[in-house]
Amino acid sequence: MPREIITLQVGQCGNQIGTEFWGRLIAEHGIGPDGIVKEFATEGTDRKDVFFYQADDQHYIPRALLIDLEPRVINSLQESEFKNLWNPENVYIDSQGGGAGNNWAVGYTHATEKYEHIMDMIDREDNSDSLEGFVLTHSIAGGTGSGFGSHMLEQLTDRYPKKIIQTYSVFPNDSERSSVVVHPYNSVLALKRLILNADAVVVIDNTSLHRIADERLQLDFASFKETNSIISTVMAASTTTLRYPGYMNNDLVGLIASLVPTPRAHFLMTSFTPLVIKGAQRRIQKTSVLDVMRRLLQPKNIMVSCGTKKGVYVSILDIIRGDVDPTDIHKSLQRIREKKIVNFIPWGPASIQVALSKQSPYANVPYRVSGCMMANHSNLGNLFARIIRTYDILRKRNAFLNVYKETPVFSENLDEFEDAKETITNLIEEYKAIQTSDYINWGMKQQQSQISQKESSSLANENGNGANNKPGKSAMAL
């Protein structure tokens, strides 16, 4: 039985990515823009029901919520060729339409005011036979995707504690390209929720997206549509085994379990090859299994700008699509081991996992074999350290804090900033510890320390001193 997934598209970036994603999915499942299955695709063995459900007239509707605080992007979707694809009851645009002003706290406050309405939308969508979890698409740099998305993560954790929460989170540029001057504040506040409330976070780094567009696709300056097309390619590829199941990784739990051996270090990097999008120059290349698997490991193809030559891989999953002989997989893995291309953790299994999946029979692709890598790497901690450094630059100058102090979240103090920084700093330390052979002992000591802190907090409450305690890290009181 298919395990259903509800997609939550939040903010401008989240909705633009989501639209590209659904465009790929309907092409791969032989569904038209109106949700009607094309005649040649009626007898397929693919699992459409994972991401779609059928209306009474048999047309397919995405299991998706479209959420934004300003109307421009969603209105454009409702006027596009996909206007009849969405369920109009699953669209939320703030009645005032003013947006969040690139302010995490404004987005978060809006969500606290509207969360019952949003949760009712999700509860109504949760009419599936076997809901497995949620996929959130958003940016952490702006106001709606970061702030509204943060509150949704907290509420989903509270209301659906046994469901998987995976995100595709776009991280800001670390260069002059970033147009949101307060993105370090927004990123730190959103990243705290991604650490505490998500089961897996696929990191999409804008810096790497533009580099890939410049170098691999030879686009002088990639548009949002082109970078979003790259992201949607990875999203579609990473969900292939859920929609075209094989022998392994047929559900979200299995997919994440193979990549996230420890609860907090659940951030993932990706790569895809061969990468082909509209508007970009095509390069004819060899697509043997070995060639694809080696290209997936090349730093220039990885969509996070933290490097992989130093540090270690915690886990790697290669999803290979096409008409592939399993013996080619074994030979390719052996060649990669012989050349010592990959450095793994010293305290766990050192192997690349491979999942095979069919190409969609309905979508024309210009290559015989394609691959998507999802990997957990210790150098992701460097990305978070970079965010903390940019945050510290603003925070030491107390720059732009007035717009945050005007919101209920920060009306009394700025403690939430420091709490978020502490949460991220702890994760950075964990990624450093992951590289050592003593990581398991380190983790046990950290766990014991947390237990001791909880016991001390409980004792303080019993003595009547609990009134000064701050709210728990997984939720925040207003």
UniProtKB/Swiss-Prot annotation:
It is found in: Cytoplasm, Cytoskeleton, Microtubule organizing center, Centrosome. GTP binds at A141, G142, G143, T144, G145, S146, G147. GO terms for cellular component: centrosome; cytoplasm; gamma-tubulin complex; microtubule. Residues 459-468 have a biased composition (Polar residues). Residues 451-478 are annotated as: Disordered. InterPro entries: Gamma_tubulin, Tub_FtsZ_C, Tubulin, Tubulin/FtsZ-like_C, Tubulin/FtsZ_2-layer-sand-dom, Tubulin/FtsZ_GTPase_sf, Tubulin_C, Tubulin_CS. GO terms for biological process: cytoplasmic microtubule organization; microtubule nucleation. GO terms for molecular function: GTP binding. It comes from the Eukaryota. Tubulin is the major constituent of microtubules. The gamma chain is found at microtubule organizing centers (MTOC) such as the spindle poles or the centrosome, suggesting that it is involved in the minus-end nucleation of microtubule assembly. This is Tubulin gamma chain.
